[in-house]
């Protein structure tokens, strides 16, 4: 992260750090906010976060930005207020404060549950791979955060959209082919 911060600083690129999944680390792993890496990262970043993913309250439309740099903070403040997206309702504010301040036991249970889901997925992939020819094996990309899984299916097909449709139709499993993140989806 420090190297990314240095490169962005040197090339006058502001880092917008989407840390919406920050609370969803696997048990035993910690989250490192980008702005906490060093002063350079803090002064050249906008950290976006919300309780919406972790606490399943997206309908409340609540989020926050943390911007240590006062000049950058003012620019973002102007943009948010010009577009009138900076006025949360009272219920959203109360729910957000409760989520962040009063939910640690529940959050620890959630993190353990999600880690169990990942272990189950890993076991299923290992079982599949044990029976599959080497050229047909898939790989679970190791991750220690979020409830999302990245599965490399490039040995199965180059038509990831077709694979996703097959999995949805025949196995009731929803996949995103990943093309929206750039590249060819595998």
Give the positions of each predicted feature:
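Active-site pre-lysine segment of PLP-dependent enzymes
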Residues: 1-12, 21-57
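Conserved core segment of the aminotransferase class I/II
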Residues: 39-115, 165
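The start of beta-strands in P-loop NTPase/AAA+ ATPase cores
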Residues: 12-14, 173
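A generic structural signal for well-ordered alpha-helical segments
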Residues: 8, 38, 125, 129, ...
């Amino acid at each position: 992260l420090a190297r990314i911060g240095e490169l962005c600083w040197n090339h006058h690129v502001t880092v917008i750090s989407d840390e919406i999944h920050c609370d969803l680390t696997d048990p035993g792993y910690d989250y490192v906010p980008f702005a906490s890496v060093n002063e350079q990262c803090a002064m050249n970043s906008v950290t976006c976060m919300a309780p919406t993913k972790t606490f399943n309250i997206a309908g409340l439309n609540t989020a926050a930005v943390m911007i240590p740099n006062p000049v950058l903070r003012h620019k973002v403040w102007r943009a948010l207020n010009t577009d009138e997206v900076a006025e949360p309702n009272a219920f959203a504010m109360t729910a957000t404060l409760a989520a962040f301040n009063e939910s640690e036991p529940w959050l620890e249970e959630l993190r353990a549950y999600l880690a169990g889901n990942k272990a189950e997925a890993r076991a299923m992939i290992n079982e599949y791979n044990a029976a599959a020819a080497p050229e047909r094996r898939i790989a679970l990309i190791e991750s220690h955060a979020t409830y999302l899984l990245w599965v490399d299916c490039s040995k199965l097909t180059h038509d990831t959209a077709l694979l996703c449709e097959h999995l949805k139709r025949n196995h009731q499993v929803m996949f995103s082919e990943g093309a929206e993140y750039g590249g060819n989806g595998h």
